[in-house]
From Swiss-Prot:
UniProt source species: Aquifex aeolicus (strain VF5)
Alphabetized InterPro entries for the sequence: DNA-dir_RNA_pol_bsu_ext_1_sf (IPR042107), DNA-dir_RNA_pol_bsu_external_1 (IPR019462), DNA-dir_RNA_pol_su2 (IPR015712), DNA-dir_RNAP_su2_dom (IPR007120), DNA-dir_RNAP_su2_hyb_sf (IPR037033), RNA_pol_bsu_bac (IPR010243), RNA_pol_bsu_CS (IPR007121), RNA_pol_bsu_protrusion (IPR007644)
Lineage: Bacteria, Pseudomonadati, Aquificota, Aquificia, Aquificales
Domain of life: Bacteria
HAMAP family membership: RNApol_bact_RpoB (MF_01321)
Protein name, per record: DNA-directed RNA polymerase subunit beta
Gene3D superfamilies reported in the protein's UniProt record: 2.40.50.100, 2.40.50.150, 3.90.1100.10, DNA-directed RNA polymerase, beta subunit, external 1 domain, DNA-directed RNA polymerase, subunit 2, domain 6, RNA polymerase alpha subunit dimerisation domain, RNA polymerase Rpb2, domain 2
GO molecular function terms noted in the UniProt entry: DNA binding; DNA-directed RNA polymerase activity; ribonucleoside binding
């Protein structure tokens, strides 16, 4: 049987209500939405690339001579497997597209696999082709050219594991957490002239996804409202008018109840709605605004001729209105009045009246208000004009007012009504609606008139022929209400809903006034309702948009010089198509959010792909991010992990989503809750965003009774960022799982609830630094998340389809697929799945990936089953470290301050041994003086130094190399010397002379040693000549390809014969069949022997053997299918061969590239860093012989001795609980081993395991589970599982916040025959004496981290020097020295170590002559030296001379000691 993960004893709930979602869904779904690769190209949704193309096209030049229209796009090469058809210009290839010739589905043809791209240093990508149609203007309209597919370049694709491969390196795009578009309200202190008074300025900002920010400010000092667009201040009413609220009446009717509009006739006022007659005196206690018409001039414009104007004016008293009515020069058009008592009682107060009054009060000498425009225009045009003047910085206008208004209208439409320039985005619309509009979820017949006061709405469900998403109108509602009593609606987020609407401005002002009066709170920028995730798809979309903008500019430029009458125009003549893919590729290569993938182990890879960052373009900077943004926020609950974040300057800015978090369609993090109805928990799951959950009472995951009712009398619940005790009936939702609040990394820490947060942070971060070990071991004490993380990180191999294991070896697994899972429509589906395993591959961090099969030949495999382990996994579970026996006690001072004492057993038995792979490469290039060459003929190198190289000068695989060894021999031509006539004659007679070359070989760098495990050679194509090396490489690759082809053919034939045997074995031949010279007699039974001999004849001519038509048809189908499959395989082989023979494109100037991979086995040693999962880290201080380690009463020596003082102050008690439980788990396993040795039967062992699993099991789930599991096993499987338990111990899972309780741990220790306090007497390994006090002992999962001493230790005698100062370079990478700074000099001075100090500052640093002399003296065995003058002193002298200061250094005899040397150098 397969090596299955042993069932764990669970302390929490074994079965979750909701399984955590796929952990890489955030980046993968985002990219899939961007490219929509698995969607029919003719049915793509309007998102991602499709949305960019649809909104950017058609391109039009200014004169509209040419129009370029978009019809669709295809990604990748597509082909029909059945007939070989490839889509032409008139058909887009893609998913679910039918072949026009034979009707089969088109199939995607991958040029290179991700593995090949990594190997060859290529980008994993596919061609992007866009179908465009060009139209050219003619006298009779537009001439349409046939659609063309234009090649836009290669678009990088995401691999199955969620990363990108760019030039052979694996990279990922970090998810960005940015401020959402929408409306935000805040308040800040307003600057006052009098510094003693502070007033608050209240602000509401509309932040679009694209375009200008519109802000309204309400001054706490004056109660007046002003507006800002792009920070430029202008009148608030001007902005309102520009957006469509033209008059005072249009504005005020939304704020006050009794607003009346009057029409003026014969100096009497008539109510516009009722027709009732009023006199001016009736408006005595009213605020009055009048629209008047008069003849006059407008100052400040080019023309000052008299014309009719309309103006809106604030009338302070009713008598002023009488005067206006009596004035023959003025015509009062309408009057708006609001009763003063209505304004006083209104929640919106006088702010709006005062603002309108302020803007429309007479300001100049002739008592005219500024709100006026020519009579043929409207007051909206006044608002547009004001906005245009302010935003375009126009002070004195030299144009006619008509031109200004016309321009202002165009300006507004471009600025605020063009999706290319201004877009709130779907997110912005949803956020505005949620913030300031009260949108009902359901509309009833009485609500029809409400539509005018709401932003656009859409149907939330299908209603008959009207689909969900259809825009709601009054007519539609009236029609639907004939059939339905209520209609469910949602936000409409397309068309004009993407712009600012008048009703938005009204409700924003209402909210702003409410904020001023303390009825609502200001927005919290750290709240996750105001921050959204921009994942990889959206980030790439933004880049593509920039590329399209450049392309459109090129289109306009080229259109100007092309004649529309030309006969053969193509889209390529007008655009540079590479802009889009170049923008995307550049972002992946150099973008701020594009990072080198951290794949130290599967957990680090998974976490890196899920990471959220507040940094990057459009985000925050480390310097500007305040504490509030970095801090844990209540809205993070269930969305962002409060534990996992870096410790440095990025703390709180780089975070991780929780296990259950997902991203909704608008980019907000959502988390699942179970619905609670009347105190009863239902199984209905709802996903809520942070801004949605605020209105609900949500309880944490709480125990329920059998009926699902909440047990407790009072329950701790959250409501509006507040935590309080509520009754069960008040609870509306309940958490899905206690692990809902933490990330995958944190969820791997057992007893997390007993660790201090700071240490848990270190624990979750250090697990990502654990090095994959040679022998992996899943933790004895886990949390139950190990399997989920191993699977979702793609470290393990999972069966795509069920079947039987046909063949298995260390490098591949072949599974014959179940017949019902084979796709018979695809000729390439041969019913065989081949899984190539990754063997000893290097990761970005130089760790080793190695996959191992865990299934056997002949075994049945289910779809989704784990069939191979990867690095840091054990039987499909994550295994980052090893369970070792630890003791908490001091040991002779060696574990002082977190140092760790380890046993030599861990070194000898390779417990913590890991493999590290170094990749070195060398290029042979073309130089000005000739070509470099990879060769074994290296001048000046003795033969023994070349012993390990092959005939081409490349190191042999399997060689053990040390620093300084030649890995690849390379020679570079020196500059050609001028030949003498004699040499020229000799050269002419004897041909080419031996070239003058120098050694430029690749040598093993310092600090690198190990075994060469692989050598890869790449040669350039199209050079016209092939050297022996290139031919050898080509030959080997072709042989591998042929072997693969033969293997697949054999598998097809084996499968064919298997199916055929099922049809004909045991049947009789129904007529005499002549086969060559032989005859198969009628009635002959077809057995194995006959079948083997005549199988090909039966397939070729079944009618010669049988008369059953149905059987003959089936045999022919099998033969035809096999023939088609072998033909297709041959075709694929020929394509691969052609690609291979083209050979790899190397960078310009490179002839040959050789890569050498050196594997180094690193045992654990002094200086390596180790850690537990609880933030308990330390460096190994000593490796003790096993016999010196403290030992248990039974003689077992401990593996690691930790300092007990590392626990109390760090408050990570989880490690102690893990140690106790680990000891119990191990000893219980030994007890089972003893039972096996005593020959106890299956029943007794099952009962014993049931007893163990029942401890701490409140609802009996565990005991029932283990009994059912063991009873389901065959005899062989049962004893295999039980022996594993005996050898490994009983694995347990203590999930976070549901961990094992103290009583359960004590009971398990007791069951294992161990002391309940988890302590025992230890004996000193050196003296054999018992220690005075009992010591805490047990098993803990310890990790070896990537911070290894071999990467850090460094020593230098001589090496490279800086050119100017002649001092040694710095750093290990440069093989540099150690800097001796001022403080070190002072220390040596203080010690009086004059000679030491002198040599440090001279011969050991930058005394060029002195250091040479010292070296010579040491070689001769003499140990004296005379220091010279340091180079840095000479540099100082030269710098002073450059300043015009002649410096003389005088010795005791008053002779210049420096000048001679300086002069000598100057003469040179």
């Amino acid at each position: 049987m397969a090596k299955i993960a042993l069932p764990r004893k669970f302390f929490g709930r074994r079965f979750e209500v909701l399984e955590p979602p796929y952990l890489l869904s955030i980046p993968k779904n985002s990219f899939e939405n961007f490219v929509q690769l698995k969607v029919n190209p003719y049915k793509r949704k309007n998102v991602g690339l499709e949305h960019i193309f649809r909104t950017s096209f058609p391109f039009k030049d200014p004169d509209e001579n040419f129009i370029l229209e978009y019809l669709g796009y295809e990604i990748g090469d597509w082909e029909c497997n059945r007939c070989g058809y490839k889509p032409k210009d008139d058909l887009l290839g893609g998913w679910d597209v039918d072949c026009p010739q034979c009707g089969a589905k088109l199939v995607y043809k991958e040029k290179f696999t991700p593995e090949e791209c990594k190997l060859k240093g290529l980008t994993y990508s596919a061609p992007l082709r866009v179908m465009l149609q060009l139209k050219a203007k003619t006298k009779n309209g537009y001439r349409e050219f046939p659609p063309k597919k234009v090649y836009f370049g290669e678009i990088p694709l995401m691999t199955e594991t969620g990363s990108f491969i760019i030039n052979g390196t694996e990279r990922i795009i970090i998810n960005q957490l940015i401020r959402s578009s929408g409306v935000f309200f805040d308040e800040k202190e307003e600057k006052q002239k009098d510094a003693t008074i502070t007033r608050i300025l209240y602000r509401g900002s509309i932040i679009p996804d694209k375009g200008s920010r519109v802000e309204f400010e309400l001054s706490g000092a004056t109660d007046l409202i002003s507006a800002r667009i792009d920070r430029k201040k202008l009148s608030a009413t001007a902005v309102l008018r520009a957006f469509g609220l033209e008059t005072a009446y249009d504005i005020l009717k939304y704020f006050y109840e009794d607003v009346r509009k009057f029409i003026v006739k014969d100096k009497y006022l008539y109510d516009a709605q009722t027709g009732e007659e009023f006199t001016p005196e009736d408006l005595e206690h009213h605020y009055i605004f009048a629209i008047i018409k008069f003849r006059g001039k407008l100052v400040g414009f080019a023309s000052s001729k008299e014309r009719d104007f309309i103006e809106e004016r604030y009338i302070e008293e009713w008598e002023d209105l009488v005067r206006l009515l009596d004035d023959d020069r003025i015509e009062v058009l309408s009057v708006t009045a609001v009763p003063r008592d209505v304004v006083i009682k209104s929640p919106y107060g006088k702010s709006l009246i005062d603002t309108l009054a302020n803007d429309t009060s007479p300001k100049d000498v002739d008592k005219r208000s500024p709100v006026k425009v020519p009579a043929e225009y409207t007051l909206r045009d006044y608002g547009l004009m004001e906005m245009y003047k302010r935003l375009r910085h126009i002070e004195a206008i030299t144009m006619e007012i008509d031109s200004v208004i016309e321009r202002a209208r165009i300006f507004f439409n471009v600025f605020f009504r063009d999706l290319k320039r201004y877009d709130l985005s779907r997110v912005g619309r949803v956020k505005i609606n949620a913030k300031v509009h009260r949108i009902p979820k359901v509309l009833k017949p009485a609500d029809v008139d409400l539509l005018d006061q709401l932003p656009p709405l859409a149907l939330a469900e299908d209603y008959g022929e009207y689909k969900a998403g259809t825009r709601v109108t009054k007519d539609l509602l009236k029609e639907l209400f004939k059939q339905y009593k209520e209609i469910k609606v949602k936000d409409y987020t397309e068309d004009e809903a993407r712009f600012i609407l008048p009703i938005d401005l009204v409700n924003i002002l209402k909210y702003l006034i409410d904020l001023r009066h303390g009825r609502v709170k200001k927005d919290d920028i750290a709240h996750l309702g105001n921050r959204r995730v921009r994942s990889v798809g959206e980030l790439l979309e933004n880049q593509a948009r920039l590329g399209i903008a450049k392309m459109e500019k090129v289109f306009r430029d080229r259109s100007a010089v092309i004649n529309p009458e030309q006969p053969d125009l193509k889209p390529q003549d007008f655009i540079n198509p590479r802009y889009v893919t170049t923008a995307i590729t550049d972002f992946l290569k150099t973008g701020q959010l594009s990072q080198y993938l951290d794949n130290t182990n599967p957990l680090s890879e998974l976490t890196h792909k899920r990471r959220l960052s507040a940094l990057g373009p459009g985000g925050l900077t480390r310097e500007s991010a305040k504490f509030e943004i970095r801090d844990v926020h209540p809205s993070h609950y269930g969305r962002i992990c409060p534990i996992e974040t870096p410790e440095g300057q990025n703390i709180g800015l780089v975070t991780s989503p929780t296990v259950y978090a997902r991203v909704n369609e608008y980019g907000f993090l959502i988390t699942p809750y179970r619905k609670v109805e009347n105190g009863k928990v239902t199984d209905k799951i709802e996903w809520l965003a942070a801004y949605e959950e605020e209105n609900y009472v949500i309880a944490q995951s709480t125990p329920t009774d059998e009926e699902g009712r909440l047990k407790a009398e009072f329950i701790l619940a959250r409501h509006k960022n507040d935590i309080r005790l509520v009754k069960p009936e008040q609870v509306e939702y309940i958490d899905v799982s206690p692990r809902q609040v933490i990330s995958p990394s944190s969820s791997l820490i057992p007893f997390l609830e007993h660790d201090d947060a700071n240490r848990a942070l270190m624990g979750s971060n250090m697990q990502r630094q654990a090095v994959p070990l040679i022998f992996t071991q899943a933790p004895l004490i886990g949390t139950g998340m190990e399997k989920k993380i191993a699977r979702d990180s793609h470290a393990v191999v999972v069966a795509k389809r069920g079947g039987v294991v046909e063949e298995v070896d260390s490098s591949k697994i072949i599974i014959r697929v179940n017949p019902e899972e084979i796709n018979f429509d695809d000729p390439l589906d041969i019913g065989i799945d081949i899984y190539e395993l990754r063997k000893f591959q290097r990761t970005n961090q130089k760790t080793c990936v190695n996959q191992r099969p865990i299934v056997r030949k002949g075994e049945k495999v289910e779809k989704g089953q784990i069939i191979a382990d990867g690095h840091s996994t054990d039987r499909g579970e994550l295994a980052l470290g090893k369970d070792v026996l630890v003791a908490f006690m001091p040991w002779r001072g060696y574990n002082f301050e977190d140092a760790i004492v380890i046993s030599e057993r861990l070194v000898k038995e390779d417990v913590y041994t890991s493999i590290h792979i170094e990749e070195l490469e060398v290029e042979a290039r073309e130089t000005k003086v000739g070509e470099e060459e990879i060769t074994r003929q290296i001048p000046g190198v003795p033969e023994r130094a070349l012993a390990h190289l092959d005939e081409h000068g490349i190191v042999r695989v399997g060689t053990y190399v040390k620093p300084g060894d030649i890995l690849v021999g390379k020679v570079t031509p020196k500059g050609e010397t001028r030949l003498t006539p004699e040499e020229k004659l000799l050269q002419a007679i004897f041909g080419e002379k031996t070239r003058d070359v120098k050694d430029a070989s690749l040598r093993c760098p310092p600090g690198v040693e190990g075994i060469v495990i692989d050598v890869q050679v790449f040669t350039r194509k199209g050079t016209g000549k092939k050297d022996m090396l290139a031919e050898k490489v080509e030959r080997e690759e072709l042989e591998a390809l042929e072997q693969e082809l033969e293997k697949k053919k054999n598998l097809i034939i084996t499968g064919r014969d298997k199916v055929l045997k099922g049809l004909v074995l045991g049947r009789k031949v129904e007529k005499d069949a002549k086969v060559g010279r032989k005859t198969v007699k009628k009635g002959t039974v077809i057995d194995e022997k006959v079948f083997e001999e005549f199988v090909n004849y039966i397939l070729g001519r079944p009618e010669n053997f049988f008369e059953d038509e149905d059987l003959i048809r089936k045999i022919r189908e099998i033969a035809e299918r096999t023939r088609t499959q072998i033909e297709m395989l041959n075709k694929v082989y020929e394509e691969k061969k052609e690609t291979l023979l083209k050979r790899r494109d190397l960078p310009p100037g490179v002839i040959t590239l050789v890569k050498v991979f050196i594997a180094n086995k690193r045992k654990i040693k002094v200086g390596d860093k180790m850690a537990g999962r609880h933030g308990n880290k330390g460096v190994i201080s000593v490796v003790l012989p096993v016999e010196d380690m403290p030992f248990l009463p039974d003689g077992t020596p401990v593996d690691i001795v930790l300092n007990p003082l590392g626990v109390p102050s760090r408050m990570n008690v989880g490690q102690i609980l893990e140690t106790h439980l680990g000891w119990a788990a191990k000893e219980l396993g030994k007890k089972i081993g003893e039972m096996i040795e005593k020959g106890r039967d299956r029943k007794a062992i099952t009962e014993y395991l049931k007893e163990i699993f029942a401890i701490g099991d409140k609802d009996g789930e565990n005991a029932k589970f283990i009994e059912e599991f063991l009873n389901s096993l065959s005899e062989e499987e049962f004893w295999s599982v039980v022996r594993d338990y005996a050898e490994r111990g009983i694995p347990m899972a203590t999930p976070a916040f549901e961990g094992a309780e103290e009583d359960a741990i004590k009971e398990l220790l007791k069951k294992a025959g161990l002391p309940e306090n988890g302590k025992t007497t230890l004996y000193d390994g050196r003296t054999g004496e018992p220690f005075d006090f009992e010591v805490t002992v047990g098993y803990m999962h310890m990790l070896k981290l990537i911070h290894m001493v071999d990467d850090k230790i460094h020593a230098r005698a001589t090496g490279p020097y800086s050119l100017v100062t002649q001092q040694p370079l710095g750093g290990r990478a440069q093989f540099g020295g150690q800097r001796l700074g001022e403080m070190e000099v002072w220390a040596l001075e203080a010690h009086g170590a004059a000679y030491t100090l002198q040599e440090m500052l001279t011969v050991k640093s930058d005394d060029v002559e002195g250091r040479t002399k010292v070296y010579e003296a040491i070689v001769k065995g003499k140990y004296t030296y005379t220091p010279g003058i340091p180079e840095s002193f000479k540099v100082l002298v030269r710098e002073l001379k450059a300043l015009g200061l002649n410096v003389k250094c005088l010795n005791g005899e008053e002779k210049p000691c420096d000048e001679v040397e300086v002069k000598e150098e100057e003469e040179k």
